[in-house]
């Protein structure tokens, strides 16, 4: 009887894992089911460009079915509960999907309501609607005080708020309002980026572009036109771009799979969910000490696929193909038609390469070829 493999989540981690499994396993060996709440896959890195009037949100969404290999069964429904003991996923319609192997790729969710006043008063670009609203706000912004704030780690794509700040500086210069605008970057960290070598690079760009910083600022609430920290410090604004706190998906919380923030404890090398058998996590949903972004999922998916395939075929997993070492390769826009790339893993974080136009062009090429590569599993 074929093994039942279920993937929960239709983001990049879920899509890649399902397609890799379908590519290497025959239908007589396994059935592969992907459960996705909306049936639409969104290229989330593109939201940054929507906010800055460089892309259209309609370009960023595609039908999930069109991105899956035909061997993958797609179930469009909300996963409400994962029963590890009974090995089944309960859906909103009341159906149960049983599994022998499970991949949890439910991502991260935005917890806007954890900060009083955040939803009502500030903007962010971590959703299609949010990016479009921010674009309109920037179009009408005529100067004074722009503030960009980030939540405590972890949150999705840590480079994105820094990229936005640098690109917003460029955007406002082109509009002729930068000379009457102060830009302030606010973070709970003691430096502008978690990796010291990257923080040093960003400090240089911020300094040359007269971008101010407020570090060790833990946002507690938003009062009118003021960000207020837990220590009572205040940062006034006319336009605030505040990235909401992140947490795990509701299905993770309801199933007792996550920690207090909903992140799933996993083995950092195998990505197996701790305390379970045959259950893995891919992408933002885990508690691993690495970046939450598409690159992470890209490198994790083949490792999980190899382990499941080996189990189905009754062999030992290939030690090279089945072990994740924390590798992340992340493009990083700095403005002026230039970008760099961040390359790091669990053990090393070398200084970023000198920003240049080649990396910027490579970033745009990747963005445009994304849809053609995700189905093949060659992303």
Task: Spell out what each predicted region is.
Residues 1-73, 152-196:
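Beta1-alpha1 glycine-rich phosphate/pyrophosphate-binding loop at the start
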Residues 1-4, 72-163, 170-176, 241:
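FAD-binding core/adjacent interface of flavoenzyme oxidoreductases
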Residues 29-33, 72-85, 97, 173-265, ...:
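A Rossmann-like FAD-binding core segment of flavoenzymes
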Residues 33, 154, 159-177, 264, ...:
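Active-site substrate-recognition segment that forms the wall
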Residues 93, 106-107, 231, 244-245, ...:
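Glycine-rich, N-terminal phosphate-binding loop of Rossmann-like dinucleotide-binding domains
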Residues 118-142, 234-300, 306, 310:
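FAD-site-proximal beta/loop scaffold in flavoenzymes
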Residues 143-204, 208, 212-214, 293-310, ...:
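Rossmann-like dinucleotide-binding core of oxidoreductases
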Residues 305-379:
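C-terminal, flexible cofactor-proximal segment of oxidoreductases
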């Amino acid at each position: 009887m074929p093994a039942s493999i279920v993937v929960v989540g239709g983001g990049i981690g879920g899509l890649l894992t399902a397609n890799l499994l379908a590519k290497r396993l025959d239908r007589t060996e396994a059935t592969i089911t992907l459960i996705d709440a909306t049936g639409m896959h969104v290229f989330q890195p593109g939201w940054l460009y929507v906010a800055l009037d460089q892309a259209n949100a309609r370009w960023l969404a595609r039908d999930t079915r069109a991105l899956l290999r035909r061997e993958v069964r797609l179930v469009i429904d909300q996963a409400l509960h994962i029963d590890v003991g009974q090995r089944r996923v309960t859906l909103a319609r009341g159906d149960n999907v049983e599994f022998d192997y499970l991949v949890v790729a439910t991502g991260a969710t935005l917890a806007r309501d954890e900060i009083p006043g955040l939803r009502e008063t500030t903007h962010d670009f971590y959703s299609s609607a949010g990016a479009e609203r921010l674009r309109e706000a920037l179009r009408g912004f005529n100067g004074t005080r722009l503030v960009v704030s980030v939540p405590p780690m972890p949150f999705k794509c840590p480079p994105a708020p820094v990229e936005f700040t640098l690109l917003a500086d460029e955007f406002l210069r082109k509009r002729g309002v930068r000379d009457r605008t102060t830009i302030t970057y606010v973070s709970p960290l003691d430096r502008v980026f978690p990796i010291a070598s990257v923080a040093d690079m960003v400090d240089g760009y911020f300094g040359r572009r007269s971008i101010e910083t407020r570090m060790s600022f833990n946002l507690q609430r938003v009062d009118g036109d003021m960000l207020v920290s837990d220590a009572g410090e205040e940062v006034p604004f006319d336009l605030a771009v505040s990235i909401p706190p992140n947490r795990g998906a509701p299905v993770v919380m309801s199933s007792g799979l996550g920690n207090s923030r909903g992140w799933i404890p996993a083995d950092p090398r195998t990505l197996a969910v701790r305390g379970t058998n045959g259950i893995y996590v891919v992408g933002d949903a885990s508690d691993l000490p690495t970046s939450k972004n598409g690159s992470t999922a890209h490198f994790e998916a083949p490792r999980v696929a190899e382990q499941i395939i080996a189990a189905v075929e009754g062999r030992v997993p290939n030690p090279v193909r089945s072990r994740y070492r924390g590798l992340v390769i992340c493009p990083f826009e700095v403005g002026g038609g230039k970008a760099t790339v961040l390359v790091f893993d669990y053990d090393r974080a070398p200084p970023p390469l000198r920003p240049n136009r080649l990396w910027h062009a490579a970033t745009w090429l990747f963005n445009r070829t994304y849809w053609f590569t995700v189905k093949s599993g060659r992303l």
